[in-house]
């Protein structure tokens, strides 16, 4: 296939990367999709669909598959990175030698840098330099629904006004995909990481059998933790009432399409961490995000008791029910304290 020119190159051929590539192509754009496994890309090309993740969604004719990274990146100045957060920096290093001089980078990855807990924008600047335009898209999106063309809305934030406008034009589809611009580059990044953690907690609560009251309380107090951390990092608190905050949080905490939620349910039912991960069979971003978010909160002096108890379950073998009782037994306080 001719990949000499495209509106967007998508890096990452998992469920979400494929869904975004399909959406862009369905919008009338020529899109190049690249993945790290050439055999997987060749299979996608042969099948013209992603049988592993989105078996019922055929690829539009304008979605092109590419096994050669240099050719994929030469095709477009705009590059959408959709990879797990723990390999984000490594993937950018892999892309760097092949990027066009006019390249612009946007990512749909939700999370923080592994171990350090840094925002992904800080990682991108370190790898690619300060001058390259950067952007992030985040919000309540399950890949299957997006790929099926069901109505979806997300938030978009960028360091560059023109890039933001161009991306909004590329992604927005009046029939099914609404893209809201947001000037809060920090907040839009952070919401997607913290919601993964809280979704594990919501799953634990349901796995234990605590019911709807407990789940809703946990979501609400989880939003408070997200807002406290965001404010400490310089984000606009109102961002967390939007798509990248409350929207993504509610979706991930309440629907079993969420791997983080299903993982938490299994833990609440008594399964071990490794056993639950094995049963999910795909990356559970919230597992690593919990450690990273807690480290970030502690460095900035932010209290996040729900996140701390989830960490205790994941990394210190604490029983999920005991963690819940620890939260319920905390000292009484004002609801708006710290927000």
Swiss-Prot record:
One of its GO terms (molecular function) is glycerol-3-phosphate dehydrogenase [NAD(P)+] activity. It catalyses: sn-glycerol 3-phosphate + NAD(+) = dihydroxyacetone phosphate + NADH + H(+); sn-glycerol 3-phosphate + NADP(+) = dihydroxyacetone phosphate + NADPH + H(+). It is an enzyme of class 1 (oxidoreductase). It is found in: Cytoplasm. GO terms for cellular component: cytosol. One of its GO terms (biological process) is glycerol-3-phosphate biosynthetic process. The keyword Lipid metabolism applies. InterPro entries: 6-PGluconate_DH-like_C_sf (IPR008927), 6PGD_dom2 (IPR013328), G3P_DH_NAD-dep (IPR006168), G3P_DH_NAD-dep_C (IPR006109), G3P_DH_NAD-dep_N (IPR011128), NAD(P)-bd_dom_sf (IPR036291). The active site is at 195 (proton acceptor). Its EC number is 1.1.1.94. Pathway: Membrane lipid metabolism; glycerophospholipid metabolism. Catalyzes the reduction of the glycolytic intermediate dihydroxyacetone phosphate (DHAP) to sn-glycerol 3-phosphate (G3P), the key precursor for phospholipid synthesis. NCBIfam families: PRK00094.1-1, PRK00094.1-2, PRK00094.1-4. Belongs to the NAD-dependent glycerol-3-phosphate dehydrogenase family. This is Glycerol-3-phosphate dehydrogenase [NAD(P)+]. It comes from Yersinia enterocolitica serotype O:8 / biotype 1B (strain NCTC 13174 / 8081).
């Amino acid at each position: 296939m001719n990949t000499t020119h495209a509106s967007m190159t998508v890096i990452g051929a998992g469920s979400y990367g494929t869904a975004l590539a399909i959406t862009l192509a369905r919008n009338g754009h020529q899109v190049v999709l690249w993945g790290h496994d050439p055999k997987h890309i060749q299979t996608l090309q042969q099948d013209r669909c992603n049988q592993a993740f989105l078996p019922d969604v055929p690829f539009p004719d304008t979605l092109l598959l590419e096994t050669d990274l240099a050719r994929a990146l030469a095709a477009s100045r705009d590059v959408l990175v959709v990879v797990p957060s723990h390999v984000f920096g490594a993937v950018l290093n892999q892309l760097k030698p092949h990027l066009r001089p006019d390249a612009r980078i946007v990512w749909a990855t939700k999370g923080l840098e592994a171990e350090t807990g840094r925002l992904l924008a800080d990682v991108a600047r370190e790898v690619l330099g300060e001058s390259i335009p950067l952007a992030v898209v985040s919000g309540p999106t399950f890949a299957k629904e997006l790929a099926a063309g069901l109505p979806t809305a997300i938030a978009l934030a960028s360091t560059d006004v023109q890039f933001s406008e161009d991306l909004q034009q590329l992604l927005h589809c009046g029939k099914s995909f609404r893209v809201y611009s947001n000037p809060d580059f920090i907040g839009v990044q952070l919401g997607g990481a913290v919601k993964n953690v809280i979704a594990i907690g919501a799953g634990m609560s349901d796995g234990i059998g605590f019911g709807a009251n407990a789940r809703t309380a946990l979501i609400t107090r989880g939003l408070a933790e997200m807002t406290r951390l965001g404010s400490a990092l310089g984000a606009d608190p109102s961002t967390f009432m939007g798509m990248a905050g409350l929207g993504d949080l509610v979706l991930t905490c309440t629907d079993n399409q969420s791997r983080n939620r299903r993982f938490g349910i299994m833990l609440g039912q008594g399964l071990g961490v490794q056993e639950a991960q094995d049963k999910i069979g795909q990356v559970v971003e919230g597992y690593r995000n919990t450690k990273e978010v807690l480290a970030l909160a502690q460095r900035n002096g932010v209290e996040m008791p729900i996140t701390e108890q989830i960490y205790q379950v994941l990394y210190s073998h604490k029983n999920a029910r005991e963690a819940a009782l620890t939260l319920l037994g905390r000292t009484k306080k004002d609801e708006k304290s710290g927000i």
